[in-house]
């Protein structure tokens, strides 16, 4: 059931007119204490302002929003391009917002797009905004997740079979005689993004399947600006890994830059596999073994799901959501050395 302004006012202990003034950002005669009470009531009740709720019932704007994690990634760029191509077939325009995986920016962009009355959203989500997405589901707002999922939330999602992707990397390295395998990922933590946690899980499980102990020192995670130091830590170990898995295209670039700056050769000094088939991988010297994601198909499928949701006159929120897993493909090249 949709939360009303009256319920917010009652929770905050103020009048409806005061809540209305707050929503219109008219704070001239409003104390900080009152503002905090209203903010907390809105958060507790997952309230969507009436003016936004009304927009959900208005005519289509033929505009959708894409809340992207980072436009620096080739994978993300390809997904967004495919979304745009698919939407153009229906004369629907696309607005793209870049969050840099900042949950606060993500929340602001989602709220801004809804306030602008876009017909729906395709989102690269973070776990921190789960409560926001729960409220959107309750209010019947059309949206789809891509690349990541949020557990215990019924939302149509299109993403890679991430465990299968990292499993393919580890299997290929083991087949070439490697047991000391390092892996580098962006930040993990308790609320790790799906791609990161699942790829690490695939790495761990595959080593376990082959009775190879997991060396926690071979697992490095951090921000992009921390990569040179993290990569250096691997190579300065007493027993460094003979092979490294870069879990996305941006990390792969950082490993290649480190190797060049430190006069390390691939695959003689270390073997390398990257998840995401970057454009230069096939003609790099040596050509880099990669795992491809069907990025264009993922973008196309997520756009089609959203457009279908928008066209539906009634939403059945009790219906189970559809989780679509796309299969990765490994591209064997020349960056993995065969050990004796």
UniProtKB/Swiss-Prot annotation:
GO terms for molecular function: DNA-binding transcription factor activity; transcription cis-regulatory region binding. Keywords: DNA-binding, Repressor, Transcription, Transcription regulation. The keyword DNA-binding applies. The keyword Transcription applies. Pfam families: LacI (PF00356), Peripla_BP_3 (PF13377). It comes from the Bacteria. Signal peptide: none annotated. SMART domains: HTH_LACI. InterPro entries: Cro/C1-type_HTH, HTH_LacI, LacI/GalR-like_sensor, Lambda_DNA-bd_dom_sf, Peripla_BP_I. Residues 5-24 bind DNA. Putative repressor of the endoglucanase operon. PANTHER family: HTH-TYPE TRANSCRIPTIONAL REPRESSOR PURR-RELATED, LACI-RELATED TRANSCRIPTIONAL REPRESSOR. This is Probable HTH-type transcriptional regulator EndR. It comes from Paenibacillus polymyxa (Bacillus polymyxa).
């Amino acid at each position: 059931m949709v939360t009303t302004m009256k319920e917010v006012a009652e929770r905050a202990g103020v009048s409806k007119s005061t809540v209305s003034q707050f929503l219109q950002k008219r704070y001239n005669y409003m104390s900080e204490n009152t503002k905090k009470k209203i903010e907390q009531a809105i958060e507790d009740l997952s309230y969507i302002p009436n003016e936004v709720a009304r927009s959900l019932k208005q005519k289509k704007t033929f505009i959708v929003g894409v809340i992207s994690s980072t436009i620096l990634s080739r994978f993300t760029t390809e997904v967004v391009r495919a979304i745009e191509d698919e939407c153009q077939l229906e004369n629907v325009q696309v607005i793209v917002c870049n969050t840099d995986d900042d949950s606060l920016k993500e929340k602001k962009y989602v709220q801004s797009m809804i306030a602008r009355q876009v017909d729906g959203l395709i989102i690269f989500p973070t776990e921190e905004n789960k409560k926001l997405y729960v409220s959107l589901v309750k209010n019947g707002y059309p949206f789809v997740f891509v690349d990541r999922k949020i557990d215990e939330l019924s939302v149509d999602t299109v993403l890679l079979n991430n465990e299968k992707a990292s499993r393919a990397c580890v299997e290929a390295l083991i087949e070439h005689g490697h047991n000391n395998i390092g892996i580098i990922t962006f930040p993990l933590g308790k609320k790790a993004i799906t791609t990161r946690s699942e790829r690490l899980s695939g790495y761990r499980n595959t080593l376990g399947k082959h009775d190879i102990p997991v060396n926690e020192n071979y697992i490095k995670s951090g921000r992009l600006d921390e990569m040179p130091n993290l990569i250096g830590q691997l190579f300065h170990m007493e027993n460094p890994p003979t092979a490294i898995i870069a879990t996305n295209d941006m990390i792969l670039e950082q490993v290649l830059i480190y190797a060049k700056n430190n006069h390390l050769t691939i695959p003689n000094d270390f073997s390398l596999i990257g998840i995401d088939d970057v454009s230069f991988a096939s003609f790099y010297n040596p050509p880099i073994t990669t795992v491809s994601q069907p990025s264009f198909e993922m973008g196309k499928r997520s756009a089609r799901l959203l457009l279908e949701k928008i066209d539906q006159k009634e939403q059945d929120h009790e219906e189970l959501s559809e989780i679509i897993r796309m299969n990765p493909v490994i591209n064997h090249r020349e960056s993995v050395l065969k050990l004796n």
